[in-house]
């Protein structure tokens, strides 16, 4: 058979409405906080851009296999209007002219959850719906993958993001995608909307690995960095509320969680000076300037922005901490 004939057959076999994204994923809700999340790993590139969908106070969706991304937006729209996740999924599958190759899971803010695996999803394919979660997979090495995901999720410790990652690890340990691995994504949204739909507001975590030899390792690294960013954002909120000691504690957590991100050390040290703790800031600035000297110039620009004391004596002392050229 010619390459052209093979391509034509492949196009005929492709479910209409979107690209192919064979994969494994999980949608879940934390019953304590109400936060909701979706996590995914696939051999397809940039899987997070089409598979994972979520909105604070509404729900989360994973749409995969012969993907119709419309299940994401339409599913959230129905749940936003009060339709339960199971009913929303049922309605969308019924309207789909080519549902046989789809695999979709939906979960709403009340924890109602449902999944669908079409009869033409490539084996091994299936799903398992548990309390406040669903795991689903297709084109896997074997039929143990989604049950391994469920077991890993149910036994995992930590917050929802940690448990979502554990489910992905469980899938990979059971064999994972028969083709290997390439990309991954994790999204966690709040139980209720704050009106700020971005990361740092309604999106507690939103990390994607577009292409990597070991996407789950990279996803975990990115999650750690974003977690540090969350601490830093919380520190800013506490400083605004004049809760200085609490703010300094979370700024320090951010710095310690991601020591390679020197900017976190910079802002922690700068804040220490602002609150008259220059002695504590001195070793931090000395270390920082020795690694990346440009931070001294950044510091010099802060007084004009109202973010550092406008005191020449303080700035002169800071300058002495930088290494001599």
Regions found by a protein language model. Give the residues of each.
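Alpha/propeptide regions of enzymes that mature by internal proteolysis
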Residues: 9-179, 210-243, 256
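Canonical tetratricopeptide repeat
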Residues: 233, 267, 301-302
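Register position in tetratricopeptide repeats
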Residues: 240, 274-275, 308
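Short coil turns that delineate tetratricopeptide repeat
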Residues: 259, 293-294
């Amino acid at each position: 058979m010619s390459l052209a004939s093979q391509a034509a057959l492949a196009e005929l076999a492709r479910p209409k409405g979107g690209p192919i994204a064979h994969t494994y994923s999980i949608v879940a809700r934390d019953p304590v906080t109400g936060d909701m999340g979706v996590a995914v790993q696939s051999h397809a590139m940039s899987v997070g851009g089409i598979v994972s969908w979520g909105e604070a106070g509404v729900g989360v969706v994973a749409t995969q296999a012969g993907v119709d991304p419309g299940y994401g937006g339409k599913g959230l729209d129905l749940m936003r209007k009060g339709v339960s996740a199971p009913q929303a999924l049922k309605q969308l599958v019924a309207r789909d002219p080519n549902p046989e190759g789809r695999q979709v899971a939906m979960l709403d803010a009340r924890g109602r959850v449902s999944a669908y695996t079409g009869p033409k999803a490539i084996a091994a394919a299936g799903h398992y719906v548990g309390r406040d979660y669903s795991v689903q997979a297709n084109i896997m090495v074997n039929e143990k993958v989604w049950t391994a995901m469920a077991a890993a999720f149910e036994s995992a410790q930590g917050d929802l993001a940690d448990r979502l990652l554990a489910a992905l690890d469980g899938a990979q340990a059971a064999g994972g995608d028969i083709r290997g691995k390439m990309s991954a994504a994790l999204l966690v949204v709040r139980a209720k909307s704050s009106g700020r739909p971005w990361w740092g507001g309604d999106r507690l975590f939103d990390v994607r690995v577009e292409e990597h030899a070991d996407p789950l390792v990279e996803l975990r690294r990115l999650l750690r960095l974003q977690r540090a960013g969350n601490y830093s954002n919380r520190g800013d909120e506490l400083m605004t509320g004049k809760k200085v000691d609490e703010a300094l504690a979370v700024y320090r957590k951010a710095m310690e969680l991601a020591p390679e991100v020197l900017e976190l050390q910079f802002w922690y040290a700068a804040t220490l000076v602002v609150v008259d703790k220059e002695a504590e800031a001195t070793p931090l600035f000395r270390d920082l300037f020795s690694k990346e000297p440009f931070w001294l110039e950044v510091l010099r620009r802060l007084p004009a922005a109202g973010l550092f004391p406008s005191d020449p004596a303080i700035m002169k002392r800071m300058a002495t901490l930088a290494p001599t050229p």
